[in-house]
UniProtKB/Swiss-Prot annotation:
Function description: Displays ATPase and GTPase activities.
Claim: Endoplasmic reticulum is one of the keywords in the record: no
Family: Belongs to the RapZ-like family.
UniProt entry tagged with the keyword Nucleotide-binding: yes
Binding locations of ATP: 8-15
Annotated NCBIfam families: PRK05416.1
Gene Ontology terms, MF aspect: ATP binding; GTP binding
Name of the protein described by the UniProt record: Nucleotide-binding protein Sbal195_0713
Binding site for GTP: 56-59
Amino acid sequence: MKLVIVSGRSGSGKSVALRVLEDLGYYCVDNLPLPLIGTLLEQLKGSNDLVAISVDVRNLPEQDKVLVKQLASLPPDTELTSFFLNSSDKILLKRYSETRRLHPLSKSQVSLQEAIKLEGKLLEPMSKLVDHYIDTSNLNIYDLSDQVRQILLGSVDKELVINFESFGFKHGMPTEADFMFDVRFLPNPHWELALRPLTGLDEPVAEFLNRQPLVNKFIWQIENLLETWLPHLERNNRSYLTVAIGCTGGQHRSVYVAEQLAKRFSNGKHKVYARHRELNNAKA
């Protein structure tokens, strides 16, 4: 069994690393308490040979000592690889300020800057135990993904991964899109009372939109545009391409168009994913 442990400071990219591992076929568990490592491996034995876990400051106290103890008790056939991700205090402060997420150590009387510094001190012993230390201060998510793949596979898989992401403009535009298409001008199922509670994943909505010549023409034009430029993007060593499709609420039109594009490109040589931001947020 192969076990990958990802640790590091909050905001340094642990979730990005876990997504890469998940794409590589690993069974991923986020923020697993260290004493449960052995139990997890025992439960997955025989069904999952690739396991990845992330640990962070919330699993303290004395995390480094607990980790050493847990690793010493791993089954002898376990092949272990460990990562520690870090970024400068300045970069972490900027990232948290941009996302407005709550830091794990933030309390009513502790500022964000103080929480970031405290976490760095608490995790310093952990950073000295790992196989691979990665400073992500100057890395974007694609650079970090490449580094993780390089370490695990011995080379960077340059197969282009295409992400089609639907979203609603009223909830804000995605920040990491390479291409963004506005489909708010297309016929809107929202005004059909029977379709209003449904989504672009539901057959009645799909049938409604498929009957609209304007919808089919626009999908074809996006497909043609991407097909034209994909070879040039691949020659530029791109690993990821994110195509964002936006409608008003991210429920009907953008979801349908993203799904249709994903189906068309799935027949090619690329890895293709369809993600629906607002639908996922509604489930959370």
